[in-house]
Regions:
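Surface-exposed, charge/polar-rich loops and edge strands
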Residues: 1-295
Length: 295
Protein backbone atom coordinates (compact mmCIF):
# COMPACT_ATOMS: atom_id res chain seq x y z
CA UNK A 1 0.00 0.00 0.00
CA UNK A 2 1.49 3.29 -1.08
CA UNK A 3 0.47 6.52 0.71
CA UNK A 4 -1.14 9.01 -1.68
CA UNK A 5 -0.93 12.78 -1.53
CA UNK A 6 -3.85 14.12 0.53
CA UNK A 7 -6.26 16.24 -1.49
CA UNK A 8 -7.90 18.15 1.31
CA UNK A 9 -8.71 21.46 2.95
CA UNK A 10 -6.84 22.87 5.93
CA UNK A 11 -8.28 25.08 8.67
CA UNK A 12 -6.96 28.63 8.72
CA UNK A 13 -4.79 28.88 11.82
CA UNK A 14 -6.31 32.15 13.02
CA UNK A 15 -9.75 30.54 13.40
CA UNK A 16 -8.61 27.55 15.43
CA UNK A 17 -9.73 28.99 18.78
CA UNK A 18 -13.23 29.61 17.41
CA UNK A 19 -14.00 26.30 15.71
CA UNK A 20 -15.88 23.47 17.38
CA UNK A 21 -16.03 19.84 16.31
CA UNK A 22 -18.03 18.06 19.02
CA UNK A 23 -18.83 14.38 19.20
CA UNK A 24 -22.36 13.36 18.26
CA UNK A 25 -22.49 11.48 21.56
CA UNK A 26 -22.86 14.73 23.53
CA UNK A 27 -25.28 16.54 21.21
CA UNK A 28 -29.04 16.63 21.46
CA UNK A 29 -31.76 18.08 19.26
CA UNK A 30 -32.92 20.85 21.60
CA UNK A 31 -31.12 23.73 19.89
CA UNK A 32 -32.57 27.04 18.80
CA UNK A 33 -30.96 28.92 15.87
CA UNK A 34 -29.39 31.39 18.31
CA UNK A 35 -27.62 28.58 20.15
CA UNK A 36 -25.88 27.19 17.07
CA UNK A 37 -22.17 27.94 17.06
CA UNK A 38 -21.33 29.59 13.76
CA UNK A 39 -18.06 27.70 13.30
CA UNK A 40 -19.10 24.15 14.08
CA UNK A 41 -17.83 21.41 11.78
CA UNK A 42 -20.60 19.09 12.91
CA UNK A 43 -22.95 21.18 10.78
CA UNK A 44 -21.32 19.48 7.78
CA UNK A 45 -21.62 15.93 9.04
CA UNK A 46 -24.92 16.16 10.91
CA UNK A 47 -26.92 19.28 9.98
CA UNK A 48 -30.08 17.47 11.10
CA UNK A 49 -28.98 17.86 14.72
CA UNK A 50 -29.07 21.63 14.53
CA UNK A 51 -31.82 22.43 12.06
CA UNK A 52 -34.45 19.75 12.00
CA UNK A 53 -34.39 16.12 12.96
CA UNK A 54 -36.50 15.11 9.97
CA UNK A 55 -34.64 16.44 6.94
CA UNK A 56 -35.11 14.98 3.51
CA UNK A 57 -31.94 13.68 1.83
CA UNK A 58 -31.90 16.69 -0.47
CA UNK A 59 -32.29 19.14 2.43
CA UNK A 60 -29.62 17.30 4.42
CA UNK A 61 -27.10 17.46 1.58
CA UNK A 62 -27.89 21.09 0.67
CA UNK A 63 -27.37 22.30 4.25
CA UNK A 64 -24.14 20.36 4.54
CA UNK A 65 -22.79 21.46 1.15
CA UNK A 66 -23.74 25.11 1.65
CA UNK A 67 -22.07 25.30 5.04
CA UNK A 68 -18.95 23.62 3.67
CA UNK A 69 -18.85 26.08 0.75
CA UNK A 70 -19.29 29.00 3.16
CA UNK A 71 -16.20 27.91 5.10
CA UNK A 72 -14.26 27.94 1.81
CA UNK A 73 -15.67 31.29 0.66
CA UNK A 74 -14.89 32.91 4.01
CA UNK A 75 -11.34 31.45 3.88
CA UNK A 76 -11.87 29.65 7.16
CA UNK A 77 -10.57 26.55 5.37
CA UNK A 78 -8.30 26.57 2.33
CA UNK A 79 -7.02 24.04 -0.21
CA UNK A 80 -3.80 22.38 0.89
CA UNK A 81 -0.63 22.46 -1.19
CA UNK A 82 0.51 19.37 -3.05
CA UNK A 83 2.70 18.26 -0.17
CA UNK A 84 2.57 15.53 2.39
CA UNK A 85 1.74 16.60 5.92
CA UNK A 86 2.67 15.19 9.31
CA UNK A 87 0.49 15.24 12.40
CA UNK A 88 2.03 15.31 15.86
CA UNK A 89 0.31 14.91 19.23
CA UNK A 90 2.10 15.75 22.48
CA UNK A 91 1.28 15.29 26.14
CA UNK A 92 3.46 15.68 29.22
CA UNK A 93 4.89 12.17 28.97
CA UNK A 94 4.31 11.08 25.39
CA UNK A 95 4.49 12.24 21.78
CA UNK A 96 3.94 10.58 18.43
CA UNK A 97 4.03 11.68 14.80
CA UNK A 98 1.98 10.26 11.96
CA UNK A 99 1.84 10.62 8.18
CA UNK A 100 -1.33 12.19 6.76
CA UNK A 101 -2.22 10.29 3.61
CA UNK A 102 -4.94 9.10 1.30
CA UNK A 103 -5.47 5.35 1.03
CA UNK A 104 -7.66 3.14 -1.13
CA UNK A 105 -10.64 1.45 0.51
CA UNK A 106 -9.91 -1.66 -1.58
CA UNK A 107 -6.97 -2.33 0.75
CA UNK A 108 -9.43 -2.57 3.63
CA UNK A 109 -11.77 -4.82 1.68
CA UNK A 110 -8.81 -7.04 0.76
CA UNK A 111 -7.76 -7.21 4.43
CA UNK A 112 -4.48 -5.38 3.93
CA UNK A 113 -5.84 -2.84 6.41
CA UNK A 114 -6.89 -4.88 9.41
CA UNK A 115 -9.30 -4.03 12.25
CA UNK A 116 -8.55 -5.00 15.84
CA UNK A 117 -12.21 -5.31 16.80
CA UNK A 118 -15.57 -6.03 15.25
CA UNK A 119 -18.06 -3.20 14.88
CA UNK A 120 -21.72 -2.53 15.50
CA UNK A 121 -23.31 -3.26 12.12
CA UNK A 122 -25.97 -0.59 12.61
CA UNK A 123 -23.34 2.07 13.34
CA UNK A 124 -21.36 1.12 10.23
CA UNK A 125 -24.49 1.60 8.13
CA UNK A 126 -25.08 4.97 9.77
CA UNK A 127 -21.57 6.14 8.84
CA UNK A 128 -22.09 4.97 5.24
CA UNK A 129 -25.36 6.91 5.02
CA UNK A 130 -23.67 10.06 6.35
CA UNK A 131 -20.83 9.79 3.83
CA UNK A 132 -23.30 9.17 1.01
CA UNK A 133 -25.26 12.28 1.93
CA UNK A 134 -22.51 14.80 2.62
CA UNK A 135 -19.63 13.35 0.52
CA UNK A 136 -17.24 14.70 3.14
CA UNK A 137 -14.83 13.09 5.62
CA UNK A 138 -14.64 15.14 8.78
CA UNK A 139 -12.31 12.99 10.86
CA UNK A 140 -9.35 10.91 9.64
CA UNK A 141 -8.97 7.21 10.30
CA UNK A 142 -6.04 6.45 12.57
CA UNK A 143 -3.82 3.55 11.51
CA UNK A 144 -0.51 2.11 12.60
CA UNK A 145 2.22 0.05 10.94
CA UNK A 146 4.85 -2.32 12.32
CA UNK A 147 7.95 -0.13 12.22
CA UNK A 148 10.23 -3.07 13.00
CA UNK A 149 9.98 -3.91 9.30
CA UNK A 150 10.03 -0.38 7.84
CA UNK A 151 12.89 2.06 8.35
CA UNK A 152 10.94 5.31 8.52
CA UNK A 153 11.65 8.01 11.10
CA UNK A 154 8.86 10.56 10.68
CA UNK A 155 10.35 12.85 13.33
CA UNK A 156 13.17 14.01 11.03
CA UNK A 157 11.00 14.88 8.02
CA UNK A 158 8.89 17.81 9.12
CA UNK A 159 9.67 21.52 9.05
CA UNK A 160 10.49 23.23 12.33
CA UNK A 161 7.39 25.42 12.53
CA UNK A 162 3.92 23.84 12.34
CA UNK A 163 1.28 25.36 10.09
CA UNK A 164 -1.35 24.52 12.72
CA UNK A 165 -0.89 24.16 16.47
CA UNK A 166 -3.46 24.14 19.26
CA UNK A 167 -4.07 22.68 22.70
CA UNK A 168 -7.12 20.60 23.60
CA UNK A 169 -7.30 19.31 27.15
CA UNK A 170 -4.01 17.65 28.07
CA UNK A 171 -2.81 17.37 24.48
CA UNK A 172 -1.08 19.66 21.98
CA UNK A 173 -1.91 18.99 18.33
CA UNK A 174 0.34 20.15 15.49
CA UNK A 175 0.28 19.85 11.69
CA UNK A 176 3.58 20.17 9.82
CA UNK A 177 4.28 20.53 6.13
CA UNK A 178 7.05 18.37 4.73
CA UNK A 179 9.01 18.45 1.50
CA UNK A 180 9.70 14.72 1.72
CA UNK A 181 8.21 12.36 -0.83
CA UNK A 182 6.65 9.29 0.79
CA UNK A 183 5.22 7.79 -2.40
CA UNK A 184 7.94 5.13 -2.56
CA UNK A 185 6.91 3.60 0.77
CA UNK A 186 5.02 0.35 0.48
CA UNK A 187 3.17 -0.78 3.59
CA UNK A 188 2.60 -4.53 3.60
CA UNK A 189 -0.21 -4.20 6.15
CA UNK A 190 -1.79 -1.53 8.31
CA UNK A 191 -3.94 -1.80 11.41
CA UNK A 192 -6.89 0.34 12.49
CA UNK A 193 -6.17 2.08 15.79
CA UNK A 194 -9.31 4.25 15.81
CA UNK A 195 -12.06 4.69 13.24
CA UNK A 196 -13.48 1.20 12.73
CA UNK A 197 -16.98 2.47 12.00
CA UNK A 198 -15.73 5.29 9.76
CA UNK A 199 -13.68 2.97 7.57
CA UNK A 200 -16.58 0.51 7.37
CA UNK A 201 -18.75 3.40 6.20
CA UNK A 202 -16.38 3.98 3.27
CA UNK A 203 -16.38 0.26 2.51
CA UNK A 204 -20.16 0.22 2.19
CA UNK A 205 -20.36 3.19 -0.20
CA UNK A 206 -19.51 1.27 -3.36
CA UNK A 207 -17.16 -1.70 -3.28
CA UNK A 208 -16.54 -1.45 -7.04
CA UNK A 209 -15.03 2.01 -6.86
CA UNK A 210 -11.50 2.91 -5.81
CA UNK A 211 -12.77 5.19 -3.07
CA UNK A 212 -10.06 7.11 -1.23
CA UNK A 213 -10.16 8.04 2.44
CA UNK A 214 -7.91 10.19 4.61
CA UNK A 215 -5.82 8.47 7.26
CA UNK A 216 -3.05 9.28 9.70
CA UNK A 217 -0.48 6.49 9.86
CA UNK A 218 1.61 6.08 13.03
CA UNK A 219 4.52 3.76 13.83
CA UNK A 220 3.47 1.00 16.20
CA UNK A 221 6.35 1.62 18.60
CA UNK A 222 5.08 5.15 19.28
CA UNK A 223 1.46 4.19 19.95
CA UNK A 224 0.16 3.87 23.50
CA UNK A 225 -2.18 1.04 24.46
CA UNK A 226 -4.78 2.84 26.55
CA UNK A 227 -7.25 1.10 28.81
CA UNK A 228 -10.71 0.95 27.27
CA UNK A 229 -13.82 -0.54 28.82
CA UNK A 230 -16.88 -2.01 27.14
CA UNK A 231 -20.13 -3.18 28.67
CA UNK A 232 -21.38 -6.22 26.74
CA UNK A 233 -24.99 -7.36 26.86
CA UNK A 234 -25.86 -10.96 26.08
CA UNK A 235 -28.57 -11.64 23.49
CA UNK A 236 -31.89 -12.61 25.03
CA UNK A 237 -31.67 -16.14 23.65
CA UNK A 238 -28.12 -16.79 24.93
CA UNK A 239 -27.52 -18.88 28.07
CA UNK A 240 -24.91 -16.78 29.86
CA UNK A 241 -23.86 -19.75 32.02
CA UNK A 242 -22.25 -21.13 28.84
CA UNK A 243 -20.22 -17.98 28.28
CA UNK A 244 -16.91 -19.10 29.79
CA UNK A 245 -17.06 -22.47 28.07
CA UNK A 246 -17.69 -20.77 24.72
CA UNK A 247 -14.89 -18.28 25.38
CA UNK A 248 -12.40 -21.07 26.09
CA UNK A 249 -12.60 -22.15 22.46
CA UNK A 250 -10.51 -19.10 21.53
CA UNK A 251 -8.90 -17.93 24.78
CA UNK A 252 -6.91 -19.21 27.74
CA UNK A 253 -8.73 -17.94 30.84
CA UNK A 254 -7.14 -17.29 34.24
CA UNK A 255 -8.75 -15.75 37.29
CA UNK A 256 -6.97 -12.68 38.65
CA UNK A 257 -6.54 -12.61 42.39
CA UNK A 258 -5.66 -8.92 42.55
CA UNK A 259 -7.34 -6.28 40.44
CA UNK A 260 -4.20 -4.12 40.43
CA UNK A 261 -2.25 -6.64 38.35
CA UNK A 262 -4.22 -6.27 35.12
CA UNK A 263 -2.02 -3.79 33.26
CA UNK A 264 -1.63 -4.62 29.53
CA UNK A 265 -3.96 -7.62 29.63
CA UNK A 266 -7.38 -8.24 28.21
CA UNK A 267 -9.61 -8.57 31.24
CA UNK A 268 -13.25 -9.55 31.67
CA UNK A 269 -15.30 -8.87 34.78
CA UNK A 270 -17.94 -11.60 34.89
CA UNK A 271 -20.07 -12.90 37.74
CA UNK A 272 -18.03 -11.06 40.36
CA UNK A 273 -14.60 -12.15 39.12
CA UNK A 274 -11.80 -10.53 37.12
CA UNK A 275 -10.59 -12.90 34.41
CA UNK A 276 -7.48 -12.45 32.26
CA UNK A 277 -7.86 -13.81 28.72
CA UNK A 278 -5.11 -14.64 26.22
CA UNK A 279 -5.82 -15.59 22.62
CA UNK A 280 -4.77 -19.15 21.79
CA UNK A 281 -1.99 -19.47 19.22
CA UNK A 282 -4.19 -21.49 16.87
CA UNK A 283 -6.41 -18.44 16.38
CA UNK A 284 -3.93 -15.56 16.13
CA UNK A 285 -4.32 -15.45 12.34
CA UNK A 286 -8.04 -14.74 12.71
CA UNK A 287 -7.45 -11.32 14.23
CA UNK A 288 -10.72 -9.62 15.13
CA UNK A 289 -12.77 -12.40 13.52
CA UNK A 290 -12.68 -14.35 16.79
CA UNK A 291 -14.70 -11.53 18.39
CA UNK A 292 -18.13 -10.50 17.19
CA UNK A 293 -20.28 -7.80 18.79
CA UNK A 294 -23.05 -8.44 16.26
CA UNK A 295 -25.70 -5.78 15.81
Amino acid sequence: MKPLLPNTYVINNKYLQSILSPSTDIIDYNFTPDQIHKLNLLQILRPDIYFNKKLSEEEFYDLSRNYYQKLINDQIIYKSDTNYYLYRIDSEDHSQTGLISLLNIQDYLNNNIKPHEKILVSKGKERAEQLSKVKFQLCPIYLFYDDQNIDLDLEIHHEKKPIIKFKSGKYVHSIYKTQSDFSSINFKELFVADGHHRIEGFAQLDVKKDTKFMAIIFPKSKCSNLAYNRSVKFPDNYAKDNFLNDLQKYFVIDELKYHENIDRFFVIYFQGKFLKIDLKKDYTSLGADCIDFGE
